[in-house]
Swiss-Prot record:
A Gene Ontology term for the protein's cellular component: cytosol
Organism name: Acaryochloris marina (strain MBIC 11017)
Domain of life: Bacteria
Catalytic activity: (1S,2R)-1-C-(indol-3-yl)glycerol 3-phosphate + L-serine = D-glyceraldehyde 3-phosphate + L-tryptophan + H2O
EC code: 4.2.1.20
Protein name per Swiss-Prot or TrEMBL: Tryptophan synthase alpha chain
Amino acid sequence: MTSVSDCFAQLRDRGQCALIPFLTAGDPDLATTASALRQLDASGADLIELGVPYSDPLADGPVIQAAATRALQRGTRLDQVLEMVTELSPEIRAPIILFTYYNPIYHRGVAEFLQQIAKAGVRGLVVPDLPLEESENLLQQAADLGIEVTLLVAPTSSKERIEKIALRSQGFIYLVSTTGVTGMRTKVENRVQDLIADLRQVTDKPIGVGFGISRTEHARQVMDWGADAAIVGSAFVNRLSEGSPSQGLSAISTFCRSLKSSLLLDA
């Protein structure tokens, strides 16, 4: 499994935009999550974001909140998620990016948490409620273990703050496409194009756009605006949760292939 940065570099050399699906670990169960990760890896996902279920997911919309609740009710905990990733990571090509809120990191201890996820094979980390001003310790310790911590840029961020985030973010920069929480929306707001342009003025790091990207035309739109990755969450979580596990796995595989096709330059 390559690093997040190396994956983006390889895609950039080929002139391709990355597809980053998101799944909630443990919904409907960890065995299905493992199968889903394999399916996504085989169906065109370039990197995969794996959410650790949390009881108070402030950045997540109703679809992902419901998935986290179901996973927690089934007893899914961080240790079990990491056991699954440990077994799975040698099998798949796409780097795994762990998405978790800061509270579980704090309670486990930054050093121990990072050592455990590095041992499991995690290559990237997104912590949506980590303030920029408090990120340095986590960023440094993670870098020492080969884990790239990606920071988020909000639509309301000032240009000065955007520049600071771009300087510190590792792997890529996560551009939030809309104010509010994650979820499926009908269109991508036009101001995302301006935000991508603002970032391009201060960094050459890859830019991934997420929150509200739920259709093939959304993914194509952000690529045409200059993004290096389309991050798709609720639409995958929703498809996996509908019907039986086998039906959900088939649905996300088909959707993943469709999204990846839309991101190819000759689509």
